[in-house]
Amino acid sequence: MSATQKNNITRLEQLDRQSTQPFPNSRKVYLTGSRPDIRVPVREISLADTPTAFGGEKNPPVFVYDTSGPYTDPEVRIDLRKGLPDVRSRWIDERGDTEILPGLTSEFGQARLADASLDALRFAHVRTPRRAKPGANVSQMHYAKKGIITPEMEYIAIRENMKLQEARAAGLLDQQHPGHSFGANTPKEITPEFVREEVARGRAIIPANINHTELEPMIIGRNFLVKINGNIGNSALGSSIEEEVEKLTWGIRWGADTVMDLSTGKHIHETREWILRNSPVPIGTVPIYQALEKVNGVAEDLTWEIFRDTLIEQAEQGVDYFTIHAGVLLRYVPLTAKRVTGIVSRGGSIMAKWCLAHHQENFLYTHFEEICEIMKAYDVSFSLGDGLRPGSVADANDAAQFGELETLGELTKIAWKHDVQVMIEGPGHVPMQLIKENMDKQLECCDEAPFYTLGPLTTDIAPGYDHITSGIGAAMIGWFGCAMLCYVTPKEHLGLPNKDDVKTGIITYKIAAHAADLAKGHPGAQIRDNALSKARFEFRWEDQFNLGLDPDTARAFHDETLPKDSAKVAHFCSMCGPKFCSMKITQEVRDYAKENGLSDESKAIEAGFQEQAARFKDEGSVIYRQV
């Protein structure tokens, strides 16, 4: 074994230990479906009893959506060198419409496998890929249109509900504000049949490549919980395979529903294999990045044949969705000439350069139906890229952006003709007053295919804080109907994000997505808010920490000023102190009402006022007294 291999193995053993820590006072539980191999993970957060002073009652556990996969299950032994346990192979085999290939069929994949110099980097357990049988279509959309409810669809229905009926029965939803959904139509309970209908209609997608069998199925659509994506990937300037796998496991721990591998540096193929074999969430890529590496970064040298081989290479590895910039047409490129920031999408600029160099139409557009044939053979979903998205608020909603969007709508209908799943990528940089126009136009042009946006960033003045400038726009567009939000980290526009940046970006976007779910009135969205608010009022500090999106940070902030264990049961915090805590005062009012037989707080307050007025008169009505 080489020194490099030994070093890699040591790093991955350390990563194993980092990635398997359960959240405090939480445990992984599995909800079983109609068959024993449908085991849907959720995180159960146990809560303390309400103190006797506040009425003394049991508080039921709260179940939350869990993207962390087996990593937070202490019953599962994680070995990143072997990959995650299989989830879906039996379901795929039962359908009888796929075949195991004799080996990798892409030229590039075969060449990498034959290169002995890569042995130290390679994932040791490379799986033999499968593909649809000749003439077959294995997409979830194809099954949905045929009226088939797949195990993946049942799994998703259970996952989206998260024991909602039990929560209602326990009173966790006695308070939930009605939402304003802008035309979305989420039922009170998500059923497998509803999942099937939404996928068949094209309003939702299930990104689930038949070669990514470690995947825990999830859904992206405006009538479901708003999802978030986290980006990882190396560059020519740095990062290793180990660092990218670490970012993956860290990102899904904090709530990334999907992850995009945007690697542009060395060993893209090998890095992606490690990521896929250790990912319980869908993995997306931008294939044109790797295709460009194959021609040494010269966009003009790209060909359809190289791109096609790249699609097959990545599909056989198990990539679940491809960003493909097929809407960057030759006639749209001049429309960007007067922009402040021109073309800011890497994929968009690559294709624009190719179109201008050859004075030909984008080969991704002219070969689109051939791409569909590849996609449906592996069930890879389209993420139709917005290569002409605005890179500044000055360029928002211009002719180039909306021209491309109209073309993406045309391509969506072509993909649906092939029963290939589609979502649409969106901007970008958009001031708040223009965000709804983006959502409305996308729904109109793309016939309600799921929208997936990068933010949008609502202002350009805050480098280093673009997770905030974009989180504002993300919450808004999520409310208006966007199905998935691509996170932005504090390093946006500045550098490659590290592990801490990944966490910050994800937490910011979990807040935005949840705020959107609340605003839409998604059933069950308010359960966690209600539970945390009750814990806050009852001074159950540990429950407050544990119900939050980031228990570690909440606990650390509290402990900065009140580190002693006694502070965890105190009826105040360091913000107001013991004498000015509004919640403590409110409880005292309630106690006064109870002691004096008063039916509500307003009567208690009025009685208190009258009592103090009488005392003032009894003491001589003197404003100032000697003390």
UniProtKB/Swiss-Prot annotation:
UniProt-recorded Gene Ontology molecular function terms: 4 iron, 4 sulfur cluster binding; carbon-carbon lyase activity; zinc ion binding
Keywords noted in UniProt: 4Fe-4S, Iron, Iron-sulfur, Lyase, Metal-binding, S-adenosyl-L-methionine, Thiamine biosynthesis, Zinc
Cofactor binding comment, as recorded: Binds 1 [4Fe-4S] cluster per subunit. The cluster is coordinated with 3 cysteines and an exchangeable S-adenosyl-L-methionine.
Pathway, per record: Cofactor biosynthesis; thiamine diphosphate biosynthesis
Catalytic activities: 5-amino-1-(5-phospho-beta-D-ribosyl)imidazole + S-adenosyl-L-methionine = 4-amino-2-methyl-5-(phosphooxymethyl)pyrimidine + CO + 5'-deoxyadenosine + formate + L-methionine + 3 H(+)
Gene3D superfamilies (alphabetical): 6.10.250.620, Radical SAM ThiC family, central domain
Biased composition (Polar residues): 1-24
Pfam family membership, one: ThiC_Rad_SAM
Chain positions covered by the region annotation Disordered: 1-29
GO biological process terms on file: thiamine biosynthetic process; thiamine diphosphate biosynthetic process
Cofactor(s) this protein requires: [4Fe-4S] cluster
Binding-site list for Zn(2+): 429, 493
Record flagged with keyword 4Fe-4S: yes
Gene Ontology CC: one annotated term: cytosol
Superkingdom of this protein's organism: Bacteria
InterPro entries: ThiC (IPR037509), ThiC-associated_dom (IPR025747), ThiC/Bza_core_dom (IPR038521), ThiC/BzaA/B (IPR002817)
EC number: 4.1.99.17
Residues engaged in binding [4Fe-4S] cluster: 573, 576, 581
Binding residues annotated for substrate, in chain numbering: 231, 260, 289, 325, 345-347, 386-389, 425, 452
Role noted for this protein: Catalyzes the synthesis of the hydroxymethylpyrimidine phosphate (HMP-P) moiety of thiamine from aminoimidazole ribotide (AIR) in a radical S-adenosyl-L-methionine (SAM)-dependent reaction.
Protein family membership: Belongs to the ThiC family.
Known partners and oligomeric status: Homodimer.
HAMAP family reported for this sequence: ThiC
Alphabetized NCBIfam families for the sequence: PRK09284.1, PRK13352.1, thiC
Protein name (Swiss-Prot/TrEMBL): Phosphomethylpyrimidine synthase
Organism from which the protein derives: Pseudomonas aeruginosa (strain UCBPP-PA14)
Taxonomy of the source species: Bacteria, Pseudomonadati, Pseudomonadota, Gammaproteobacteria, Pseudomonadales
